[in-house]
Amino acid sequence: MPNVLSDDEELLNGLGSEIMKPSRQGNHMARTVKRWVNKERATTADLKNVNIDGVHGPVNTESYISPGQLYSTDSGNLFHAGRILVVLVGLPATSKTLLSVAITRYTRWLGVRTKSFHFSEYKESAKNIPSDYFCVVPTSKEGVAFVEKLRMQMLNDILAFFNDLSGQLAIYDALNIRKIDRKNLETTFSEIGVKVLFIESIVSDQEIMNRNIALALESNDYKGLSTDEAIDEYMRRLSVNEPYYEMMTHDEELSYIKYINLGKQIIVKDNIHGYLVNKIVFFLMNLRQKKGCVYFARCGTSDKDNYIHDEELNEEGIHYSQVLKDFVLQRIKQKRQAKKNSDSLVEVIDGSHDEDLKTSLIVWTGPRKRTHDTALFFSKEGIKVQQRSELRQLNPGSIADLTDQQIMDKFPSEYKESLKDPYHFRFPRAESYHDLAVRMEPLLLEMEHTSKDILIIAHESTLRVLYGYLMACTCVELPNLNFTRDKLVEISFSPFCNTVELLNIPLTS
């Protein structure tokens, strides 16, 4: 057998490392070479402490391990992909920021060290901003100098991310609508061994364009302007840049993806970047503009709350189910009414929209009886309820239905190990949270594909994984997230980050 370790450094702590030495027999066939290195000790966390979207947080090179990460390497690079720069291309209000943040969230979840760099953020931190900064070719000397200064600052930060922070995927979010600018980026980064992939976002659908414009007008660029003034200013910026827009073509000899109307059509040219870029393309095929919120709720109670016996709801659990249904429907109706009363241009930025609840709300539940039965009152209202096998709770294996003291007595060494790394550790014949996250990836993609309001009724273990993805939690935080039955978790979407609100369910009247 060839020496796998010397054949490819990527297998050092990843796929295939277990074949280098005989495995030690045990309850869960422990590895002799650690897959996870430099792991932080887990600390307690609740939703109040992790209610800020972590998608823009720093990547800690010493301990960066993501919930969906399959393996780790010494270099930090995964999927044999090397370093990649993704360059967004498009006019204002064509979903470039939405794409950059969504790709960042997904690839970070996979374990790729990713960071998005937004021109708008650099502009907001600058002083003495000239009035023509928004044009790809400013008309004043001050504007030219200002844009060039910010551009160089962004490029230097991207280089530092690759060289100093072991970054693997950087996303450059700016207009990049001229061929000469794209060619310069390709030349600059190819010379240092960074592959460059362009994603051109094209929006011709008027409904998508209108919502993008409304979202853009909510940004700091238009702060203090009336609605009419903001629209006029936006149209001025668009008209100034349109003459310089050169759509990507084959004669540029660049690798690119044309992303048309938020995934209704995707064109890929010269994809020479391998598996990781293919994962990104597949993700983009599933990505849609969000018009709804995601709600998380625990299932109702049963008499013994056992794992082994698939119990039915008790009287308290049935009462909870009725109250949950009333509360969720009331919340959605309130949000829609608030939208109607608002003079904001953002049609559905907070998740409310105009469709009937029977068609605009979907309920996903786990496969166990009490989880599905918690949603029966929604079915009676004519709302679609789906049992999802992916929402099957974490399998506790040999420790099912044991108390903490019983686990300590029966599995003392395993219990101590589980405290060191509760995310990756498996008890005998059990799943780890990592196993759960990997098998739930198809559901994450379907959640990205759905524009409706979604209520997910599930066990706490699966809610932790879903919340961890949407709020970019680390694998240190995720196992300790606390979901209680008296709280409904509401996650709303915006292009730059997700927001969460904890709502009190009125279980006592």
Swiss-Prot record:
The keyword Cell division does not apply. Its EC number is 2.7.1.105, 3.1.3.46. Residues 6-291 are annotated as: 6-phosphofructo-2-kinase. Beta-D-fructose 2,6-bisphosphate binds at R298, Y433, R464. Keywords: ATP-binding, Cytoplasm, Hydrolase, Kinase, Multifunctional enzyme, Nucleotide-binding, Phosphoprotein, Transferase. It is found in: Cytoplasm. Its main location: cytoplasm. It catalyses: beta-D-fructose 2,6-bisphosphate + H2O = beta-D-fructose 6-phosphate + phosphate; beta-D-fructose 6-phosphate + ATP = beta-D-fructose 2,6-bisphosphate + ADP + H(+). The record marks R298, H459 as: Transition state stabilizer. The active site is at D173 (proton donor/acceptor). Induction: Expression is under the control of the RFX1 transcription factor. Residues 292-466 are annotated as: Fructose-2,6-bisphosphatase. Present with 3380 molecules/cell in log phase SD medium. This is Putative 6-phosphofructo-2-kinase/fructose-2,6-bisphosphatase YLR345W. It comes from Saccharomyces cerevisiae (strain ATCC 204508 / S288c). The lineage of its organism: Eukaryota, Fungi, Dikarya, Ascomycota, Saccharomycotina.
